[in-house]
Every structure is written in C-alpha cells, then in structure tokens.
Amino acid sequence: MALDVDVDSLVIGGGIVGMSVAYGLARKGDRVVVLDGVDDAYRASRGNFGLVWVQNKGLTRPGYARWTMRAAQNWAALATELYDLTGVDVELQQPGGLTMSFDEGLLTTASKKLDALGEELGIRYPYERMNVTELKSLTPDIGPDVVGAIYCPLDGHVSPLRTLRALTQALISLKGELVPGVNVTKIEHRGNEFVVHSNKKAFFAKRVVLTAGLGNKVLGEMVGLNVPVRPQRGQILVTERLRPFLKHPCHYVRQTGEGIVQIGDSKEEVGFDDATTLAELSRIAARAIRCFPVLKDVNVVRTWGGLRVMTPDGYPIYEESKQYPGAYVVTCHSGITLAPVHAGPLVEWMHKGSQPQEIQSFTSERFNV
C-alpha cells in the first residue's frame, strides 16, 4: 500500500465540474487532490457539446436563471485567467446564441416564457425575437423552413477538451494534484477529517467534494447525502471542416474555430447505454439540414454518445452533509456553462459557509416534498 496522503480538500471526480471546483479551491490556497476514475468510467465531459448557454435556463426556477447568467458573464475572465496560467486557449466565443424555430406559434410561446421569466427576475430578459430577415443578416445560410429564432447575447461556446486541459494544468500550476485510475471504496469521518479509502491508497482531508457525476449517487450515501441522479444519453455528429458559415452557435448546431460542425441535442432515457444509433443520428442530422441546407452533402467524420447527469427536475444539487459537515456534493448537467461560478462563488461557500442566494434551494431535500 502506498503512503497515505493528507490534504485540505479532496475532490472526487475529475471532469469539468470537479476540475472547476478543484481549481477554485487551489486558487483560495488549499492543498487540493483530485481523484479521477478509471478509463472506462462514464464521463459527461468527453461527450460535451461545449455550449455556454443562458437562454431558456431556469424557466421554472429563477434562481437558476440568475446563476447561469452570472456564470456566462464571468466566462471571459475565466478564459483569460486560464490562458495566462497555462497558455491553453479554450476557444471561448460569445457572439450570442440562436434557438431556431420552424413554427411561428412556438416562437411566440418561447418569447412569452422569456418575458415572464424576466418579470420574475425584475429585469428585461436579454433576448431578441428575430424574424427571417433579421436572422439572415446574422446567418445567411438558414433554410426555407426556418421562420425565425430567439437570440440571446450572453450565449456562446468553448472547446470542452481544451477547457478540461486548461483547468487541469491550472490546478497543477497551483500545486494541486490529479490522481487517475482511482476507485473510491469507502469514506469515513474521523474527528475533524475524512478518510477516503481507494484501490490505491488512503487519503485524509478536511473537506471532501463529490463531483463524480453519475457516481455521486453511491458516494453520497457514504457521507449521508441523497443524490438521486440518472443518466440521459445524448448523441453527437461531427463533420469535416467547412468554410465558416455559422458564427452564432445554435442549440443543436455549432461550428468550431477549426471549421468542423457539431450536431447534437438528442435526449434519450436508455440507462447507461452510451452507444450511438442510426435512427437518432439520422433524426438530428435531418433537423440540422433543415436549419442549414449547406450541411446536406458534407462528410461525417465522427459520432459518439455521452451520458448527461440528470436529477429528477433537471436542476443541480449543491449540498453540504448535515451528518458529516465538510462533505459536499456538486452535481449538474451544465458543467461547461457553470464553470466560472463553480470555481468562484461555490468555492467561497465551502470556505466561508455563506451559500450564494441563487442556489440556496438546490439541495436534495426538494425531492422529499
């Protein structure tokens, strides 16, 4: 057995959510170790679409809308900070995002929902309803079936893989450590610290943060936390490089800086099956072609399936264990969008005990009603 390790904060889960929290903790001066799973673990970060997305978030929970806006407004600062520390460009672009519509009635419904959310927030919600003429001024290549779109100036996208690399390198630059291939078998609370047993060694920490995605369900039980998460499959198509035609990312189509186009936004309840299916890939491809006919004859170079981490109501869980104070769970399905607030105000809560107002209702207790 290797020597035990004693740290300030132990983060279990090395995806986007975990590395954002770990980086934030290291930035506060903690000695941080991140335990990451084995190579065949289900990883939402590897299948991420890369959107920094605000519109339509929090329609039934205004606090989440505020939290998401706060994150998007701080993404540029985080991207700059990561570049200065690591030299890794996460390829952030925030030109505003588009949700295309093929139906005027649905477009009207979407507008009314955003207006109502703005009233609840006490603001004019940051969006524009665009007709076809206005939309073509932004995106000339739309198809004839598109009747308009919702545009939100806060939306954008990043490279998920570059973001994960930048966060990891930033953590290491702040004397943090990432330990791969770890299977946590038991978490104990002894006195003022936690003992985390694994297949490699025992880790001692004053604070334990569970960010293991779908693995949080089992890990949470070890520290008195209820984490009712389930997998939801999403499938993605990646095309060959194309001429730049899509400056503004859409909810299910985006073009990267290299010119490739990603097509996605499928939602399937199929358990832990992360395979791709011809039927679903065909459906999302047809929708993308309907939006942008230029995609009709392009070559697809890659497809993959990934598993989102979903709670019963689709919103995050941010909670400290009442039974074992110092043990936290952080779980969500918008790890890219929320990275700045996970590295910032969420870490402030863990250090100072004052939870951000926007997320005070996001404990698992809401599922007991």
Task: Enumerate the language-model features and the residues they cover.
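Dinucleotide-binding Rossmann-like beta1-alpha1 core, especially the glycine-rich loop
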Residues: 50-134, 138, 287-289
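Helical element adjacent to the flavin cofactor pocket in flavoenzyme catalytic cores
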Residues: 150-206, 215
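Helix-loop-beta segment of a Rossmann-like dinucleotide-binding subdomain
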Residues: 87-101, 126-174, 266-270, 325, ...
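Active-site lid/adjacent beta-loop-alpha segment flanking the redox-cofactor pocket in flavoenzymes
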Residues: 240-327
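N-terminal Rossmann-like FAD-binding beta1-loop-alpha1 element of flavoenzymes
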Residues: 7-34
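Central helical "cap/lid" subdomain
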Residues: 42, 198-245
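Glycine-rich FAD pyrophosphate-binding loop
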Residues: 26-48
